[in-house]
């Protein structure tokens, strides 16, 4: 058995589709432009963010400071896209957060939020996660403003199983969704979810794969904090 459908996976991997879903559910995102629209923008509208439509790991991402750099950034982003397409949008100045949810047996439960710092590795490297600290300093504001809308989005997509995470920007306490993963993250974040919120995402996915039931999902926030600090030894490690 598989915890997701190909339609769900494609909609969440495709940054354009994901942001359209967010907007339909009243969740803010960065303003997006077509290539033709971007060509007509005044320099005062810059910087822009240019990225592959369906890429990952910040590969092919560029912060474009002026109109003269747009074409090169688009070409680079397209080279990293499976679909050969790109996203052009406002560059958001703000801190990043990672928001976690867990789905099991049709129940979808908020499972934490962490403040995220990124660092560029080497001159030619892409920015990658350098530190996460949970809970986020603005956790309650997120819960008050967007938690219900995010859960409604997942339910409207028919999601019933699996780990979910969202990268969002926190701009002075206002959140803008950026992208989403319908899978485990690459930083063993299911440990964070288990230790800080009492939800075992790995056990829930094992149960789904074997036809079992991991029981009712109940978030039990713990006191204290949890940090993820990856040590990058060399490129690729």
Where do the protein language model's features map onto the residues?
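ATP-binding N-terminal substructure of ATP-dependent carboxylate-amine bond-forming enzymes
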Residues: 1-7, 24, 211-215, 233
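A short, GP-enriched loop/loop-strand-helix hinge that lies immediately N-terminal to
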Residues: 1-13, 26-34
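Structural element of the ATP-grasp superfamily
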Residues: 18-23, 88
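Basic phosphate/pyrophosphate-binding loop/patch that engages nucleotide-derived ligands
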Residues: 21-28, 69, 79-80
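ATP-dependent carboxylate/phosphate-activation module, predominantly the ATP-grasp catalytic core
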Residues: 90-97, 101-159, 163, 170, ...
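Glycine-rich active-site loop/lid that clamps phosphate-bearing ligands
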Residues: 231-237
């Amino acid at each position: 058995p598989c915890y997701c459908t190909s339609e769900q996976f494609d909609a969440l991997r495709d940054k354009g589709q994901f942001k359209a879903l967010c907007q339909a559910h009243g969740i803010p995102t960065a303003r997006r432009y077509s290539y033709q629209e971007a060509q007509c923008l005044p320099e005062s509208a810059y910087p822009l963010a240019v990225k592959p439509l369906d890429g990952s790991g910040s590969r092919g991402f560029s912060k474009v400071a002026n109109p003269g750099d747009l074409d090169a950034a688009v070409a680079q982003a397209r080279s990293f896209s499976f679909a050969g397409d790109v996203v052009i949008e406002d560059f958001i100045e703000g801190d990043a957060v990672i928001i976690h949810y867990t789905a099991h047996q049709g129940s979808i439960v908020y499972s934490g939020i962490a403040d995220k710092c990124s660092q560029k590795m080497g001159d030619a490297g892409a920015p990658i996660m350098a530190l996460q600290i949970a809970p986020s300093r603005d956790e309650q504001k997120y819960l008050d403003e967007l938690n219900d809308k995010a859960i409604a989005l997942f339910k409207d997509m028919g999601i019933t199983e699996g780990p979910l995470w969202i990268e969002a920007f926190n701009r002075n306490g206002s959140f803008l969704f950026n992208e989403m993963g319908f899978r485990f993250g690459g930083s063993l974040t299911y440990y964070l979810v288990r230790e800080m919120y009492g939800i075992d995402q790995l056990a829930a996915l094992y149960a789904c794969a074997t036809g079992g039931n991991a029981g009712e999902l109940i978030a039990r926030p713990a006191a204290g904090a949890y940090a993820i600090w990856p040590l990058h030894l060399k490129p690729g490690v």
